[in-house]
UniProtKB/Swiss-Prot annotation:
SUPFAM superfamilies: P-loop containing nucleoside triphosphate hydrolases (SSF52540). The modification Phosphoserine is found at S43, S65, S196. Present with 17600 molecules/cell in log phase SD medium. It is found in: Cytoplasm; Nucleus. Interacts with LSG1. One of its GO terms (molecular function) is ATP hydrolysis activity. Belongs to the ABC transporter superfamily. ABCF family. EF3 subfamily. This is ABC transporter ATP-binding protein ARB1.
């Protein structure tokens, strides 16, 4: 056999390699083909989940912001105050803020107000990502996402984040010295930050914050990957409070807290000595925490001094004066127009008419006083129902524990009842079983002993913290309700009216629900709840995401409803408006509170440890 040349040997080897790869590829393709069908459905779910995530982050498919902003820094680069002029904000082409101003002074605590869907969360995101020209030395933290799932316990998570923050500041000090020299004005606040962090006390201070937010000696050691979304939000909040950024942005921080934790957070934030911008729909909380208000209304940011009550009083006075000026000016305009019209061609009056027309033209050029645009007020309404004789819902000596923890009863020998006149508030710290009690009422959970009696015609309507999970966020509200209740009606106009009755109107009905605010999605859930025509309402944190006027409308609807109501809520003002009976859930039972909800709040405030 003649010898094979080296070049031919290489060619043969490459050919064999290609054939081997081809054969392997064929096997791979066959394997992939078998897996492809199984993975198809999963990949569609993943794609939908990613789409929803990107919409919530307000980013396009490439991860770029869907927001368009303008703003000019008017304060000094070295200042801890932030002053911006020419502030504008567009989201998906919709103007949210136009040519406005923003001033955030160090040490002040601002409440950001505005109706659902006006763009408060979008504005906070734009601030947090420095789409506005905020100096780099001002560190910013936005709380709008839970802590990441990890192997770290709640305590370790907060301490680790604090260590990262300390390292970040040390690196920034080093960078500032190299770039600006050791005399830089930026160094003093950085040294203050380092001193305030105090690594020797990391664990003890982190534990105080976590316990204040509702953790106990056991749950503080639980891994974040094993926590529910609500508890992960508390961990993220604890981290934010612990590292104390120069600019702290909190988007509805009380949404996942019980009354006790809300009181603790209110007391803590009262002492926050940096800059805070807070979105909250709890009037009581805003009154307790805020030194200033920013009203996001009519595409403008309007600043007010004082807390929410002070803002409400000042705004009412300003609007009253504005309407007086508007009416006076309109009378003057009508008088001028009437004179001009009556002047006709009379020679002696034509000159006067021209003079008055100039006055009118100047008034218009200078800008006429605009009438006050009233808030959009709509009324929640739960359909009236047939009255049922008592007992409608009764617990007789029940005891309950979860199967995963049979040695620890949540309830023992509990007696409790609900009838058509009930307006019951369940209060108490997280983990004592308030939501569990509602699930026992619905029959979702069954007690191990005792008896639960339900009237044969009772129809329970349930609103929970997880009610929004039923919504397909890739659909519009209009598409979703029509598809879900296709047996009721296929007519879009019918569903427009149904959603409109709960304050979701116009474009809010037709855009994908992932782009709606939490409050707007809540309105969809309430519209669905009303369709079921329940005669007893079980409401678990119904105010989450709702703006203050909407919460007032909800309170009115509950008071006008002729069925029974049981509410779990952290909103003291709602409970003050509706609760006739307050039951404190603790020590494995529910005990009637002899006093008002505000007296209960004062009791909690006395026990706060900071």
């Amino acid at each position: 056999m003649p010898p094979v040349s080296a070049s031919k040997a290489k060619r043969d080897a490459k050919k064999a390699e290609r054939e081997a790869k081809k054969a392997a590829a064929g096997k791979t393709i066959r394997k992939l083909g078998r897996k492809k069908e199984a993975a198809a459905e999963e990949s569609e779910v993943d794609a939908a989940a990613r789409e929803i995530k990107m919409m919530k982050l307000q980013q396009d498919k490439d991860g770029l912001s869907d927001r368009v902003v303008t703003g000019v820094l008017s304060s000094l680069e070295t200042s801890r105050d932030i002053k911006l002029s020419s502030v504008s904000l567009l989201f998906h082409g919709k103007v949210l803020i136009q040519d406005s101003g923003l001033e955030l002074n160090y040490g002040r605590r601002y409440g950001l107000l505005g109706e659902n869907g006006c763009g408060k969360s979008t504005f906070l995101k734009a601030l947090a990502t420095r789409e506005y020209p905020i100096p780099e030395h001002i560190d910013i933290y936005l709380l709008d996402e839970p802590a990441e799932p990890s192997e770290l316990s709640a305590l370790d998570y907060v301490v680790t984040e604090a260590q990262h923050e300390l390292k970040r500041i040390e690196d920034l000090v080093e960078k500032t010295i190299l770039e600006d020299g050791p005399e830089s004005e930026l160094l003093e606040p950085l040294y203050e930050r380092m001193d305030s962090l105090d690594p020797d006390t990391f664990e003890s201070r982190a534990a105080i914050i976590l316990i204040g937010l509702g953790f106990n000696k056991k749950t503080i050691l639980k891994k974040t990957k094993d926590m529910s979304g609500g508890w992960k939000m508390r961990v993220a909040l604890a981290k934010a409070l612990f590292v104390k950024p120069t600019l702290l942005l909190l988007d509805d921080p009380t949404a996942h807290l019980d009354l006790e934790a809300c009181v603790w957070l209110e007391e803590y934030l009262k002492r926050f000595d940096r800059t805070l911008v807070l979105v909250s729909h709890s009037q009581d909380f805003l009154n307790g925490v805020c030194t200033n208000m920013i009203d996001m209304r009519a595409q403008k940011l309007t600043a007010y001094g004082g807390n929410y009550d002070s803002y409400h009083k000042t705004r009412s006075e300003l609007e009253t004066n504005q309407m007086k000026q508007y009416n006076k000016q309109q009378e003057e305009i009508q008088h001028i127009k009437k004179f001009i019209a009556s002047a006709g061609t009379y020679a002696n009056l034509v000159k006067q008419a021209k003079s008055r027309q100039k006055i009118l033209d100047k008034m218009e050029a200078d800008g006429l006083v605009q009438p006050v645009v009233p808030d959009k007020v709509f009324s929640f309404r739960f359909p009236q129902v047939e009255r049922l004789p008592p007992p409608v819902l009764a617990f007789d000596d029940i005891s309950f524990h979860y199967e995963s923890n049979p040695s620890e009863n949540l309830y023992e020998h509990l007696n409790f009842g609900v009838d058509m006149d009930s307006r019951i508030a369940l209060v108490g710290p997280n983990g004592v079983g308030k939501s569990t009690l509602l699930k026992i009422m619905t029959g979702e959970l069954t007690p191990q002993s005792g008896r639960v009696s339900r009237h044969t015609h009772v129809k329970l309507g349930v609103y929970s913290q997880h009610s929004q999970d039923q919504l397909d966020l890739t659909k519009s509200a209009l598409e979703f309700v029509r598809d879900k209740y296709s047996n009721i009606s296929q007519d879009f106009q019918f569903w427009r009216g149904q959603l409109g009755r709960y304050g979701l109107t116009g474009e809010g009905q037709t855009v994908q629900m992932a782009t709606l605010s939490e409050g707007q999605r809540s309105r969809v859930v309430f519209a669905l709840l009303a369709l079921e025509q329940p005669n007893v309402l079980l409401l678990d944190e119904p105010t989450n995401g709702l703006d203050i006027p909407t919460i007032d409308s909800l309170a009115d609807a509950i008071n006008e409803f002729n069925g029974g109501v049981v509410v779990v809520s952290h909103d003291f003002r709602l409970l003050d408006k509706i609760a006739q009976d307050i039951f404190v859930v603790e020590n494995k039972t529910a005990t009637r509170w002899d006093g008002s909800i505000l007296q209960y709040k004062n009791k909690l405030a006395k026990n706060v440890v900071l």
